[in-house]
A protein has these predicted regions:
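Active-site core of metal-dependent hydrolases
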Residues: 1-59
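His/Asp/Glu-enriched, well-ordered alpha-helical/loop segment
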Residues: 4-6, 43-47, 58-145
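Short, glycine-/Ser/Thr-/acidic-enriched flexible segments
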Residues: 14-15, 42-45, 80-81, 149-150, ...
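Short Asp/Glu-rich motifs
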Residues: 49-50, 85-86, 156, 182
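Short low-complexity, flexible loop/linker segments enriched in glycine and/or proline
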Residues: 52-56, 89-92, 160-162
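C-terminal cap of metal-dependent C-N hydrolases
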Residues: 136-183
Length: 183
């Protein structure tokens, strides 16, 4: 009781196999609880259902449905080059790209705010509160991406231009330049 936002359910892959009627009832209770959800879509799509005969389960939780129902859901990766997901590399934009595909979140509204799944929603899951965001008095921890929108950041897998931690610049990147020669 009263734990609410201090509780996070990770993976919740079984939810992808529940029928809609059950999920409708479950979502009401989950929303009232105020808990957070973290999905690791690259790991889930790899691990879940791999030994099923056809049709195979997708094995990923209902990210889009949780989000649209007003619950806090974020994406992550908990396997970095290990037996559970050997291609894990910690690149959160790659996870987001895969997650948007896997979770059928290619609609206009989803793409306009997709970075929330790996930024704002993640900060809410971690209960960072006043320790997160850009405002006077808050720690200056941020990465500036070489993109002008969430959509472009994911579509182009934008690289960080500047990384700042505690107000100190840790890294800057000069944009890549490609020159074509006449054939």
């Amino acid at each position: 009781r009263g734990m609410g936002s201090r509780v996070t359910a990770s993976h919740t892959t079984a939810m992808g196999s529940y029928d809609n009627a059950y999920c409708f009832k479950l979502f009401r209770l989950l929303k009232m609880s105020g808990i957070n959800f973290v999905s690791c879509p690259t790991e889930s799509i790899h691990l879940q259902g791999r030994f099923d005969s056809f049709p195979k389960r997708r094995g990923v939780t209902r990210v889009a449905e949780l989000d649209r129902a007003g619950m806090n859901v974020c994406l992550g990766q908990d396997s970095i080059k290990d037996p559970w997901y050997p291609l894990g590399n910690g690149n959160i934009l790659r996870v987001l790209d895969a997650g948007l595909h896997i979770c059928h979140m290619m609609g206009f509204e989803d793409l306009q705010r997709c970075l929330d799944l790996v930024t704002d929603n993640s900060a809410r899951t971690l209960n960072l509160g006043e320790g997160y965001g850009i405002a006077v008095g808050r720690p200056a921890n941020l990465v500036i991406l070489d993109a002008d929108s969430d959509y472009e950041a994911v579509r182009r897998q934008a690289k960080g231009r500047v990384s700042i931690r505690g107000g100190k610049v840790l890294m800057t990147r000069v944009p890549e330049r490609v020159e074509f020669t006449a054939a």
